[in-house]
């Protein structure tokens, strides 16, 4: 019997062929902090033989990574910024995947009384009137953009606030930790709050205003702008993210019996 002896180069080729394909996906810190990635990524690997490398940043930075061609796709939650990204030719299309909502967290004693507010604008007005400590992410993330728009809708200018308003320039988890340490108010996405372990004396005080709706969307980077991006893999991932299996995993992801996201992709 003849034995096949492989040279070093051939061995490397075979070894590379056995490895899963890889792509880079920029995701928000709120998505990462929710823990959902730990559920989805192993199933993506199993079904597609695809390793998805996450770059965890705020929405603003994720969009800049996409504009630079440093990632193959983005998963973010700021529709206005996403539409500008598409209008600039940086993405091929926007596909809504899932949603949750933003919530206002604060000290259990609720000195500003926001638990009884009629809407988000009133809750923020009461925090401002009380001069109660408030932590802002201050990082150009989707959550930060939404927070600023809510202050503006309430007729308030965050840039003019006093020392009670603290912009920390950090992700959702770090900002929640700061709020916990300061016993301060903060706006969070519901998923990050539910998965947050250092709640201390904080509690969910206000939710339910329709303006707090929080949509996540997936956008592949345009290969006509950046020929090196792995557009084929990005499209494979998109089709998986809108599949029945992804829907079941997303809708079934719960903490203490409470769902963190609702799948709403149109197929």
Question: Where does each model-flagged region fall?
Answer:
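Exported/periplasmic ABC-transporter solute-binding proteins
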Residues: 21-51, 55, 60, 64-70, ...
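Bacterial N-terminal signal peptides
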Residues: 7-15
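Sec/Tat signal peptide C-region and signal peptidase I cleavage site
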Residues: 16-20
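Short, conserved active-site loops that position catalytic residues or coordinate cofactors/metal ions
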Residues: 69, 100-101
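Serine endopeptidase catalytic core focused on the charge-relay Asp
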Residues: 104
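Positively charged n-region of N-terminal signal peptides that target proteins for export
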Residues: 1-4
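Acidic, polar ligand-binding/catalytic clefts
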Residues: 73-99
């Amino acid at each position: 019997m003849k034995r096949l002896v492989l040279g070093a180069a051939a061995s490397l080729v075979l070894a590379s062929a056995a490895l899963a394909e890889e792509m880079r996906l920029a995701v928000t810190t709120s998505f990462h902090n929710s823990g959902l990635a730990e559920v989805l990524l192993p199933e993506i690997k199993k079904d597609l033989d695809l390793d998805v490398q996450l770059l965890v940043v705020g929405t603003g930075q994720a969009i800049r990574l996409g504009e630079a061609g440093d990632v193959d796709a983005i998963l973010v939650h700021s529709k206005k910024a996403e539409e500008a990204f598409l209008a600039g030719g940086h993405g091929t299309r926007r596909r809504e995947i899932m949603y949750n909502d933003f919530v206002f967290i604060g000290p259990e004693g609720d000195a500003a009384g926001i638990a009884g507010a009629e809407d988000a604008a009133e809750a923020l007005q009461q925090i401002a009137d009380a001069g109660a400590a408030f932590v802002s992410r201050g990082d150009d993330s989707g959550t930060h953009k939404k927070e600023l728009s809510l202050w503006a809708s309430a007729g308030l200018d965050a840039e003019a606030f006093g020392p009670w308003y603290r912009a920390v320039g950090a992700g959702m988890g770090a900002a929640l930790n700061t709020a916990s340490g300061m016993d301060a108010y903060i706006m969070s996405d519901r998923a990050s709050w539910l998965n947050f372990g250092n709640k201390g004396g904080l509690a969910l005080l206000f939710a339910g205003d329709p303006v707090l709706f929080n949509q996540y969307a997936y956008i592949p980077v345009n290969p006509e702008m950046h020929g090196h991006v792995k557009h084929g893999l990005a499209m494979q991932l998109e089709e998986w993210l809108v599949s029945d299996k992804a829907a079941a995993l997303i809708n079934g992801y719960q903490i203490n019996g409470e769902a963190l996201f609702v799948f709403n992709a149109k197929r």
